[in-house]
Amino acid sequence: MRRINLKYWLWKVSIFYRSMVTRATKYIPKILLRIDNAHDLLEKIDSSAFLAVWFVHPLNGQLNRQLTMSNIALIYMPEIVIETGTYVGSSTPYLASLASNQMITIESQQKFLAQAKKHFIHLGLFAEKISIIHGDSSVEINKVLSQIPQENKILFYLDAHWDSVLPLKEELELITNRGGSFIVAIDDFQIPDDSSFGYDHYDGEAINLGLIPNTFKGELWLPNHSADFESGARKGTAYLFSELALSEIEVSKVFGIRHYRNWS
């Protein structure tokens, strides 16, 4: 009797499921954008109705990205996690679980924040762990950083780019100029040597290496797998490790990423 490789078949089933879910749901955001009151509609629909839709799952529904972020948090143990681009709060509860002290999330659209707060209440999250800030992330993040002790380790998840707004360059400049120990994960990033991952661009400007400031000192790490092994939106992710963070952890032990280049 031929032996069945259980791991292989479980992998095949998971790939099939991811493919079917992605095909069935990738058009939903486009359809919603054509509705004048799309977010009014979302408020009236129970969140459980969207369990198979990537944009209401943590980190765009990308399971390998979640594993990488969880592994980073386990090794790095950040006191504070800062998210820019709360949207409706689909990633915030997950990111809050990675912080030993406080989770701070920044959103520029009041409409999205209202929906996010409803989401947090529904989940029964305690308010003292999550601080919600309304405003331009490129402005508010500077205020937030000025109140955090320099010795605190911070994990950032930057996803505030939306429509024609791209505050990423300003966010990164503020973070790197502050210095200290930090790790930054950038969503929707163009992977320079792997075109299988999607990425975003705004007014002709792509989210790529060109937005990383010269003031950054550290290393850039990228996914060590193709988008075929990712779920959800399958967008690229960049991970920036500051020099101090590199001295505190062994990055080569982090799941799912590879060294791309040094920045100095």
How would you name each of these model-derived features?
Residues 2-155, 160-264:
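A short alpha-helical cap/connector motif
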